[in-house]
Structures are given as structure tokens and as C-alpha cells.
Amino acid sequence: MKENRKIIHIDMDAFYASIEQRDNPKYKGKPLIVGGDPNRRGVVATCSYEARKYGIHSAMPSLTAYKLCPKAIFIRPRMEVYKKVSRQVMNILNEYSNLVEHLSLDEAFVDVSKSKRCKGSATLMALEIKERIFKEVGLTASAGVSFNKFLAKMASDFRKPDGITVITEENSKDFIRNIPIGKFFGVGRVTKNKLNNIGVFKGEDLLKFSEEELIDIFSDRGKILYEFARGIDNRPVNPYRIRKSIGKEITLREDIEDIDEMIEILERIAERVSESLCLLNKKGKTVTLKVKFNDFKHITRSITLEHFLKEQKEIMECVKDLISIVDFKNKKVRLLGITISSLEENIITEEREQLSFDV
């Protein structure tokens, strides 16, 4: 399985925002933010590259984004449209291999090791896929090509937007040595800080530690760090990857109608959901709020972000955005719930932490 593998990672560029700019020419070239209203409890789902120049990023409170760029255009997500476009992209990928692992609406791994397309060249296939996505869907994508999933994912992030990077066995060591440790796939803020504390700032710094030393410091995560630093990742591309969700809900002892009281309860639910994500080594892109009224009718509201999350802070930013668009119609609430879906395995498990709530 490890010999002669050819893995492509396709990552759509600013997917939601790019679709909106494609469908609405008036948005092209302008700072566009897909997410919540800055005048209410809103959160940025994603934004155009024009908006990113101002320091705006996914999961940022919409009000903060507005302060950074008052001229930004804010629009609500159109999830059904994004799902339809995603299917178009994935259908293209499926023509190149039956081993396509969908990570989310906007990214996937493709194992083309046995594909005869483009004379068997993974690089040419990646270029052709990018060209077809642009011609048939009207969007750009970035591609990473390598001999395993870790390096293919790292490569696709290297030249965004609309780039392609190829990492071979010959150049992989140099590539990894120069990558900031915070850019390593699966290394979050907590692990990054812990690595910095032992003098690890780039991939090359990890090479100074033996496998035993890293395991001693990071437990099972140490073995993964040791292997990633050496370009080792034997995980197969899994087309049957099971989509799951993690959620918690609370039936209230007394029906309530005060929004601030609901937020306080949702904070506790979000904390429990975050703990479950950490324990199960998961993170997700889609946050769903469930509200059941005292007449036993219920509604759900969802938002899908561009990046994966697991921390209570980020979950609550989304929940506050979602509850702001719920029409309570003067009805009291008897149940509240939060679910995280579109899950991705957290390759390197983050240690549990006390959140500092800094953005």
C-alpha cells in the first residue's frame, strides 16, 4: 500500500464566497463575507480573498469583521446551492478514481495510483482536474500531489488560491523541514504551543527528537508527530468514510423565553459538545442549533464553516448567530440542543485545555 502511491488533495478556494461571486458579478473583486449579520450575533462562515486582506477569517465574529472592513458585503449562506456545486466537483473527481474520500463540501482526497488517465501522471491529472473544475463549474481549486495524504494535504495549502504543489520523495524532506509547525496537518493551537515550549517551531526542529522522546511528551500523538516529520503517513484513502455527528441537548425543567438565559444554557451545552469532540478525537464544520417549543414543535438552524472546529468559543459564536435568526413567535422554549457534523478526524489529539476565549 505504501509503494508508488499517488494521492491528490483538492481544496476549493474560498468555496462559498467564490460561488457567490460567480453567481453575482457585482460581488467580484469586492470584500465579501458569507455568514451572519454584524448588527446581530453573527459569525463569519467564510470570506473572499479580498476580505482576507483585511485580516478577516472564518469563525470571526461578524461585528469584528465589520470593524476591520466596514465596506465589506455581508450575505447569508445558501447551503443548498453549495451542496449542489459540491456534487458537481465530486462527480469530476469520481471520473479519475473510485477511491475518493470526501472530507467536506469543498475538499477531498483522490487516490490515483492505479488510474490510467493522463498516462498515469498524478500531476497531469491534478492539472486536468483543476482545469475541468474551472471550465465546468466556474471555480478555482488548489491541488496537492504527493505519495501520502499528509503531504498531499500540506501541498494543497502551499500555493493558494488556484495553485498546485507536487511533493516527491526526493523533495519531501526539504519541504517538511521548512514548514512552520502550526501548519502541520492536525496540529492545533494547544499542541503548537506545547511544541514551541520545547523548541519546535518548524518541521526540522521535530527531527531532533526521538520517537521515544515525543511519545513521552505527547503520548500516542508523539508517534504521529515523529512520522509526519519524516514524511510517513500510511493511512489509505477511504471512500467509505462514515459521516457522523456529535450533539447534546437539554430538556429544561421550566419553559423559558429570555434569550440571555438561553445563551447561558447553550454555553453549557457547547462546553459538553466540545469535551465530547476532544474525547472522540473529532472536529467538525457544521454547527446545528435545535430549539423545541412548549407546543412540542421544533426547528433547527445550521451553519457550515470553511474550517473545522471543536472549541467551545467557536461553537458558541456560531450558535449565537443561529439563535439570532430564530423566530420565537412569543413561544416559550422547553429544549435546546447543539450538534456538530461534517466531522473530520483530528489526526493529532489536542490535550484538553481551559479556553482563554481569545480570538
Curated annotation (Swiss-Prot):
Gene Ontology process terms (BP): DNA-templated DNA replication; error-prone translesion synthesis; SOS response
UniProt-listed Enzyme Commission number(s): 2.7.7.7
Active site: E107
Gene3D superfamilies, alphabetized: 3.30.70.270, 3.40.1170.60, 5' to 3' exonuclease, C-terminal subdomain, DNA polymerase, Y-family, little finger domain
Keyword tags: Cytoplasm, DNA damage, DNA repair, DNA replication, DNA-binding, DNA-directed DNA polymerase, Magnesium, Metal-binding, Mutator protein, Nucleotidyltransferase, Transferase
Disulfide bond residue pairs: none
InterPro entries, per the entry: DNA/RNA_pol_sf, DNA_pol_Y-fam_lit_finger_sf, DNA_pol_Y-fam_little_finger, DNA_polymerase-Y, DNApol_IV, Rev_trsase/Diguanyl_cyclase, UmuC
UniProt site (Substrate discrimination): Y16
Pfam families according to UniProt: IMS, IMS_C
Keyword DNA-binding recorded: yes
Catalytic activity: DNA(n) + a 2'-deoxyribonucleoside 5'-triphosphate = DNA(n+1) + diphosphate
Xref: NCBIfam families: PRK02406.1 (NF002677), PRK14133.1 (NF010731)
Stated family: Belongs to the DNA polymerase type-Y family.
Summary of subunit composition and partner proteins: Monomer.
Protein name: DNA polymerase IV
Species whose genome carries this gene: Clostridium perfringens (strain ATCC 13124 / DSM 756 / JCM 1290 / NCIMB 6125 / NCTC 8237 / Type A)
